[in-house]
């Protein structure tokens, strides 16, 4: 299930490798796909495994682990971009140059500038440590805010999607972070981007919450079906 999530999340960023390609590659079989694409997927999986090994949940006072924090997020980013596309774009550190969302011809959103990124990410980190809202709504806010900050020069989408199960695990809504939404986002990528864009353009959180929570239901149903099959 984790490998499938890694494949789907990476597909949103332009990779073409399938789960079958990944499994064949790891079994030592020949595959007709770029090696770097497969390693991007493997790195995604490694980044999540790193987080699982190093974070503790919000009410676990006996663990030596760390809270879900920018320190964890930066290390995940470093692992994600290790020796693959984007490895020259400051892995493990917040952006030093302005980034944009969209194509060169059509920029539809300009994220937070580099000089304000640390401040905004510190605020987001503090927000992740509170539980004053419904946790599913809060996870929708965390994901959207991360994407609007776009703190790294590359790899923001994948890290932002990883934050969803990690946040719910950290807040103890999940006993293990095996809840993934990349399949839902990938099913209509333009709609996903449109809802995120409308938050910044029109402050339209209502439609984002509706879209996101519908995705929670779809993803939960999909996860349940997979567990039954396995």
Which residues are covered by each model-predicted region?
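FIC/Doc superfamily catalytic core
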Residues: 1-230
């Amino acid at each position: 299930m984790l490998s499938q999530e890694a494949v789907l999340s990476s597909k949103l960023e332009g990779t073409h490798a399938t789960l079958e390609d990944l499994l064949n590659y790891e079994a030592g079989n020949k595959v007709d796909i770029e090696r770097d694409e497969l390693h991007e997927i493997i790195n995604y999986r490694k980044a999540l495994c790193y987080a699982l090994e190093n974070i503790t949940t919000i009410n676990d006072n006996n663990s030596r682990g760390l809270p879900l924090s920018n320190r964890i997020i930066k290390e995940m980013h470093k692992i994600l971009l290790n020796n693959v596309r984007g490895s020259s774009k400051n892995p493990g550190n917040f952006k030093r140059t302005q980034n944009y969302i969209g194509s060169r011809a059509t920029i539809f959103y300009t994220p937070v500038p580099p000089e304000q990124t640390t401040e905004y990410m510190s605020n987001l980190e503090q927000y992740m440590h509170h539980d004053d809202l419904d946790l599913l709504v809060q996870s929708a806010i965390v994901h959207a805010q991360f994407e609007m900050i776009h703190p790294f020069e590359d790899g923001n989408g994948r890290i932002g999607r990883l934050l969803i199960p990690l946040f719910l695990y950290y807040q103890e809504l999940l006993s293990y972070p095996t809840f993934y939404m990349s399949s839902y986002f990938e099913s209509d990528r333009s709609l996903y981007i449109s809802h995120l864009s409308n938050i910044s353009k029109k402050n339209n959180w209502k439609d984002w919450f509706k879209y996101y929570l519908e995705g929670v239901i779809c993803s939960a149903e999909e996860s349940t079906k997979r567990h039954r099959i396995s």
